Amino acid sequence: MSLKKSPFFELRSGSVDTLLFTVKTTDLDALRTELVKRFEATPEFFADDVVAIDVRRLADGERVALADIRQMLNDVRMRPVGVVALATQGWAGEAGLPLLEARDRRAPAAKPADEAEPAAVLAVEAAAAPAAAAAPEQSSDPVPTLLQAGGQTLVIDRPLRSGQQIYAKGDLVVLAPVSHGAEIIAEGNIHIYAPLRGRALAGVHGNHDARIFCTCLEPELISIAGIYRTTENPLPADVLGKSVQIRLEEEKLMIEPLRLT
């Protein structure tokens, strides 16, 4: 086989960001009920988002019907793309979904099945076939925009419109408004010196020490290391539209006013 480069396609190692749907119960009826309850108030929020099914929290010997969970996620308009499992969970590869390797830093801990936990946002890599990735192109059109800085701080000084996305491998500094429908993602901290009206996700590879700093908090979603909060739960008056810092404390998001004077 010739090793000459093809002008028509390219295969190379890559990674994508996806929601991580962590399964902590084998009771699929209860899981379905909770999914409907969670999404009925904001049915469009995660529409068409890709998601990986994470079964690492299940106890030894427990199994779930991944095909049924896949259908549940399809029913709420999410797109399951694979399964994240432990090496001992060989059954996870029988559902017809590719096995993925999550690059989160913290190993999953056993928790009670009735303890509420939101989906996590993590970067996952396919264990079998590498993903083809195209170089991002700059455009003034309101389409998704992906920018990466290899471990360095990325500074954005232009407004972000609906549908645009920024990704930073280190810290991210934004000096202009983040509109509804726009998304900013960083593996480190996020600093926003303007109104945040879209989504902000910090510490996306499981960095629980990451923080979000914002001078005007009016978000659709905020997240650190996969722990998130949406506007489905209104923010308190002392932080809504104010300067704040957001951090994690014992797996809970803490939103605190910033004292700038």
Curated annotation (Swiss-Prot):
Listed Pfam families: MinC_C, MinC_N
Designated gene of the protein: minC
Its job: Cell division inhibitor that blocks the formation of polar Z ring septums. Rapidly oscillates between the poles of the cell to destabilize FtsZ filaments that have formed before they mature into polar Z rings. Prevents FtsZ polymerization.
InterPro entries: CAP/MinC_C, MinC, MinC_C_sf, MinC_N, Septum_form_inhib_MinC_C
Family, per entry: Belongs to the MinC family.
Subunit: Interacts with MinD and FtsZ.
Entry annotated with the keyword Cell division: yes
Protein name per its UniProtKB record: Probable septum site-determining protein MinC
Statement: the UniProt record of this protein carries the keyword Cell cycle: yes
One GO term of the biological process aspect: cell morphogenesis
Keywords: Cell cycle, Cell division, Septation
HAMAP family the UniProt entry points to: MinC
Organism of this sequence: Burkholderia cenocepacia (strain ATCC BAA-245 / DSM 16553 / LMG 16656 / NCTC 13227 / J2315 / CF5610)
